[in-house]
């Protein structure tokens, strides 16, 4: 009998929960409007619900009236933006994920020590923009092995590397291997800068791939970690679709006869997962459902001190 295999863990991580709660509690405490720099997390469903409650999402701090409260998103911001907020008299509340903050701190520390930092990630992603702002003259962003091969440094230069927290572990490992081959002296943090939730969701998906021939990744197309989940499946030869609404679960699935895997990005609400699951069961009524637990998660991040 065909079955749906639900990955666990999936969906919201501790950093996303903290960021969403930061906006919700701020609205409860101070009322609307509360301004938020960038989407608080990369998921349209989450952003739309918070907008209905009174959050105003902006990209330019000039859009925020003086002396208003502004929340920085989970992805982090460059120091220059914090300075701009202070200069404009804004009351800033920081919802940056603690694991992103850890990368910022490491970059700042090693830049002060004279190291050049190789930052592995998508250079246009808001997280990378924020990290790069810590030491723009001492950071080089690389997205792939070809860019590693084009780096101008010598085997004597002091080099340190970190990664975007939401990268594919597969891709990051390949890039790191290329870096170490060229620069044996390069080093990083004692623990990976790819966050625990990214590692767990990718690990949970890899765990079920031998049992399925099709995967739905429930997540927003703007979500880095959701896109990386899709790539994890495709890299291992399993067809994967990134969907963010049950309407995107289509009769295409009827072309496949094997088991179906379902996972969700770290910014995806569980009610969206369940809605997509119901649509799938409508299309294929005799599917059974099995949960595949990869690891338990119990990480909790405290809300910002202002709340």
Swiss-Prot record:
[4Fe-4S] cluster binds at residues 13, 97, 195. Its cofactor is [4Fe-4S] cluster. The active site is at residue 127. GO terms for biological process: dimethylallyl diphosphate biosynthetic process; isopentenyl diphosphate biosynthetic process, methylerythritol 4-phosphate pathway; terpenoid biosynthetic process. It comes from the Bacteria. This is 4-hydroxy-3-methylbut-2-enyl diphosphate reductase. Its EC number is 1.17.7.4. It catalyses: isopentenyl diphosphate + 2 oxidized [2Fe-2S]-[ferredoxin] + H2O = (2E)-4-hydroxy-3-methylbut-2-enyl diphosphate + 2 reduced [2Fe-2S]-[ferredoxin] + 2 H(+); dimethylallyl diphosphate + 2 oxidized [2Fe-2S]-[ferredoxin] + H2O = (2E)-4-hydroxy-3-methylbut-2-enyl diphosphate + 2 reduced [2Fe-2S]-[ferredoxin] + 2 H(+). Isopentenyl diphosphate binds at residues 42, 75, 125, 223-225, 267. Pfam families: LYTB. Pathway: Isoprenoid biosynthesis; dimethylallyl diphosphate biosynthesis; dimethylallyl diphosphate from (2E)-4-hydroxy-3-methylbutenyl diphosphate: step 1/1; Isoprenoid biosynthesis; isopentenyl diphosphate biosynthesis via DXP pathway; isopentenyl diphosphate from 1-deoxy-D-xylulose 5-phosphate: step 6/6. Binds 1 [4Fe-4S] cluster per subunit. Belongs to the IspH family. GO terms for molecular function: 4 iron, 4 sulfur cluster binding; 4-hydroxy-3-methylbut-2-enyl diphosphate reductase activity; metal ion binding. The lineage of its organism: Bacteria, Pseudomonadati, Chlamydiota, Chlamydiia, Chlamydiales. Dimethylallyl diphosphate binds at residues 42, 75, 125, 223-225, 267. Transmembrane segments: none annotated. Keywords: 4Fe-4S, Iron, Iron-sulfur, Isoprene biosynthesis, Metal-binding, Oxidoreductase. (2E)-4-hydroxy-3-methylbut-2-enyl diphosphate binds at residues 42, 75, 125, 165, 223-225, 267. Catalyzes the conversion of 1-hydroxy-2-methyl-2-(E)-butenyl 4-diphosphate (HMBPP) into a mixture of isopentenyl diphosphate (IPP) and dimethylallyl diphosphate (DMAPP). Acts in the terminal step of the DOXP/MEP pathway for isoprenoid precursor biosynthesis. Gene3D superfamilies: 3.40.50.11270, 4-hydroxy-3-methylbut-2-enyl diphosphate reductase, catalytic domain.
């Amino acid at each position: 009998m065909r079955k749906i295999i639900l990955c666990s863990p999936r969906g919201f991580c501790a950093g996303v929960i903290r960021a969403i709660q930061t906006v919700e509690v701020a609205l409860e405490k101070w009322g609307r409007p509360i301004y938020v720099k960038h989407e608080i997390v990369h998921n349209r469903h989450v952003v739309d619900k918070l907008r209905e409650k009174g959050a105003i999402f902006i990209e330019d701090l000039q859009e925020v009236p003086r002396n208003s409260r502004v929340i920085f998103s989970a992805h982090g911001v460059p120091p220059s933006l914090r300075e701009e907020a202070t200069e404009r008299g804004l009351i800033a509340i920081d919802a940056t994920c603690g694991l992103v903050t850890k990368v910022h701190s490491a970059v700042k520390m090693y830049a002060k020590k004279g190291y050049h930092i190789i930052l592995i990630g998508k250079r246009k992603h808001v997280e990378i923009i924020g990290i790069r702002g810590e030491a723009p003259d001492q950071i080089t962003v690389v997205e792939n092995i070809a860019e590693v091969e084009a780096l101008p440094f010598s085997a004597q230069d002091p080099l340190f590397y970190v990664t975007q927290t939401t990268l594919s572990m597969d891709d990051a490992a390949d890039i790191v291997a290329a870096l170490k081959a060229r620069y044996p002296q390069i080093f990083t943090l004692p623990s990976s800068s790819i966050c625990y939730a990214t590692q767990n969701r990718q690990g949970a998906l890899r765990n079920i791939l031998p049992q399925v021939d099709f995967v739905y990744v429930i997540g927003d197309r703007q979500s880095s970690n959701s896109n990386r989940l899709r790539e994890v499946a495709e890299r291992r030869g399993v067809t994967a679709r990134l969907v963010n609404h049950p309407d995107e679960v289509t009769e295409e699935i009827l072309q496949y006869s094997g088991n179906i895997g379902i996972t969700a990005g770290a910014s995806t609400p569980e009610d969206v997962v369940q809605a997509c699951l119901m649509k799938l069961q409508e299309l294929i009524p005799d599917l059974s459902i099995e949960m595949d637990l990869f690891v338990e998660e119990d990480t909790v991040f405290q809300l910002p001190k202002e709340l």
